[in-house]
Design a protein with these regions (language model features):
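All-alpha RGS (Regulator of G-protein Signaling) helical domain and cognate RGS-like helical scaffolds
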Residues: 1-129
Length: 129
């Protein structure tokens, strides 16, 4: 979703800044989690169409974002990212509660805290558009 919004013109600068930040934050986290899975002999994460995870947006919402412009695109991005973050927070909270590998639990704490803060920021921006 970040790549989609970053490829558009007329997007609120606060939204562009968030999308850029999301890409910077999530890349290393995903690499770390995939590295752990690989070390443990487990399959790595996949973004296979049709495979659902908490917070994943339906294809029609992604298509609507791709077709949207300006303020509408900004609103769709923020709404979708809030939903995505809520799913990520739920998964992180599960890891915090049940996780057994301390580095993964620590990463889950970091992700949960950051994404809760980001949701507050996104809700504020959304209310101002």
């Amino acid at each position: 979703m970040s790549d989609t919004i970053l490829g558009k013109q007329g997007i609120d600068p606060r939204v562009v800044q968030l999308a850029t930040q999301f890409k910077a934050d999530q890349g290393p986290e995903l690499q770390q989690m995939q590295s752990w899975l690989s070390q443990w002999g487990q399959p790595t994460l996949s973004m296979t169409p049709g495979v659902e995870m908490p917070g994943m947006l339906p294809d029609q919402d992604i298509a609507a974002l791709k077709n949207a412009q300006g303020v509408d695109a900004s609103k769709r991005f923020l709404t979708g990212m809030i939903e995505c973050h809520e799913g990520t927070i739920a998964m992180a909270e599960d890891e915090i509660k049940d996780g057994q590998y301390p580095p993964a639990v620590a990463l889950a704490h970091s992700i949960s805290t950051r994404e809760q803060q980001e949701n507050t920021t996104m809700q504020g921006i959304l209310a101002s558009l």
